[in-house]
Amino acid sequence: MTMLLDGGPQFPGLGVGSFGAPRHHEMPNREPAGMGLNPFGDSTHAAAAAAAAAAFKLSPAAAHDLSSGQSSAFTPQGSGYANALGHHHHHHHHHHHTSQVPSYGGAASAAFNSTREFLFRQRSSGLSEAASGGGQHGLFAGSASSLHAPAGIPEPPSYLLFPGLHEQGAGHPSPTGHVDNNQVHLGLRGELFGRADPYRPVASPRTDPYAAGAQFPNYSPMNMNMGVNVAAHHGPGAFFRYMRQPIKQELSCKWIDEAQLSRPKKSCDRTFSTMHELVTHVTMEHVGGPEQNNHVCYWEECPREGKSFKAKYKLVNHIRVHTGEKPFPCPFPGCGKIFARSENLKIHKRTHTGEKPFKCEFEGCDRRFANSSDRKKHMHVHTSDKPYICKVCDKSYTHPSSLRKHMKVHESQGSDSSPAASSGYESSTPPAIASANSKDTTKTPSAVQTSTSHNPGLPPNFNEWYV
């Protein structure tokens, strides 16, 4: 990490005196001052810092001295800190094993060849505090406070880059700074300030994606101002303003009170935010209690048109058609189906269990069914009853599904003059006969019927009488 300090007598406690006149060196690895060397875009201070800068870099082994309590004013962050935060600029780290700065040129080259992370900027306002001594955590306290916002904006303690270092130095505050909100602010003229955060952190329902830093107990992940786990100090941010908010569902009661004298009669039109509130309202205020004898649905545009039910529970089940209430979900995982009546749920669960309790009562038939209605439809096969009659051609069928298939033939005839062209509909005519009709259109209908009855290779059309 690069730390550019103002060369001058303002750091006597750090053991650094004044430097000589600045020398101009060729620095090919550095961008111009206006290209991001100074995060504040101040070319004057950037030029001064670039001209009279000093870099301090110790042995990489000193990166681990912080945990053992050894005092060090400047600790290299190239080995421990960069590896903890996932930096891969290994080609920039040149290990200069020196305990002091031998010359300005060597220090400047070491500074400009290392990673650019921290820039010390001369504060124009100036602070009255002077650096009288160098504590172990004095510099890192100033570095850690670099992510706080400018004056007048509250700064959460979660912005600390090195919370472990502050915990270690809590009992030994730096004599060169002051403590504010558990943060030790360095009282130097070159105290580091980060770029002001223009975005407020927002709440996130997910866990911390930077949990990889847990393996480094003394370091916390960088970019803590990205809005993860710091939302406890701020309200919802600007990011959620652009997220699509869920549309508030309003359920309206369309029950018409028959006691109204006005014409036309108006519906209730009370709105509710949940289905439970709507159902409770209809049951308590419109359907009535056990004393109610008239079980009639007065919902707007109800197709029953005032026809009464024999029992109250039947009226309640019917009202679910209007309200859309389905209080009986399938308990089997992954199914997700819901039903308005418990009887339908009971029948549906047999599709999961494979239970078929209804056996065909005809002797010699082993067919079983999941519900009694399917068994009743099947019984027409044995009795030769055909209660399902076509209203167009008076044909009758033993099963309603056969009648539905037959009705598609009439639908195809309405769209196409040829019955063979089914237009995607399934007809009751066998495919072989349909293909014969399409190939030979000169045959009369009687000839087709004769060929059908005398063709031993064609099976009978079982779809007409059995499903």
From Swiss-Prot:
| UniProt-recorded Gene Ontology molecular function terms | DNA-binding transcription activator activity, RNA polymerase II-specific; DNA-binding transcription factor activity; DNA-binding transcription factor activity, RNA polymerase II-specific; RNA polymerase II cis-regulatory region sequence-specific DNA binding; sequence-specific DNA binding; sequence-specific double-stranded DNA binding; transcription coactivator activity; zinc ion binding
Motif Nuclear localization signal, per the record, lies over: 297-322, 330-352
Q: State how changing residue 314 to M affects the protein, per the record.
A: Does not increase its cytoplasmic localization
- Gene name, per UniProt, is ZIC3
Disordered: annotated segments? 66-107, 404-467
A Pfam family hit: zf-C2H2_15
Q: What is the effect of changing residue 253 to S?
A: In HTX1; increases strongly its cytoplasmic localization; lacks DNA-binding; does not inhibit transcriptional activation and interaction with GLI3
* GO BP terms: atrial cardiac muscle tissue development; axial mesoderm development; central nervous system development; central nervous system segmentation; cranial skeletal system development; determination of digestive tract left/right asymmetry; determination of left/right asymmetry in nervous system; determination of left/right symmetry
The disease this record links to the protein is: Heterotaxy, visceral, 1, X-linked: A form of visceral heterotaxy, a complex disorder due to disruption of the normal left-right asymmetry of the thoracoabdominal organs. Visceral heterotaxy or situs ambiguus results in randomization of the placement of visceral organs, including the heart, lungs, liver, spleen, and stomach. The organs are oriented randomly with respect to the left-right axis and with respect to one another. It can be associated with a variety of congenital defects including cardiac malformations. VACTERL association X-linked with or without hydrocephalus: A syndrome characterized by a non-random association of congenital defects. Affected individuals manifest vertebral anomalies (V), anal atresia (A), cardiac malformations (C), tracheoesophageal fistula (TE), renal anomalies (R) such as urethral atresia with hydronephrosis, and limb anomalies (L) such as hexadactyly, humeral hypoplasia, radial aplasia, and proximally placed thumb. Some patients may have hydrocephalus. Some cases of VACTERL-H are associated with increased chromosome breakage and rearrangement.
Organism, as annotated:
Homo sapiens (Human)
Function, as annotated, reads: Acts as a transcriptional activator. Required in the earliest stages in both axial midline development and left-right (LR) asymmetry specification. Binds to the minimal GLI-consensus sequence 5'-GGGTGGTC-3'.
What lineage is on file?
Eukaryota, Metazoa, Chordata, Craniata, Vertebrata
What changing residue 109 to C does, per the record, is: In CHTD1; does not affect its transcriptional activator activity; decrease in nuclear localization
Full protein name = Zinc finger protein ZIC 3
Biased composition range(s): Basic residues: 86-98
Regions of compositional bias (Polar residues) in chain numbering: 67-80, 435-455
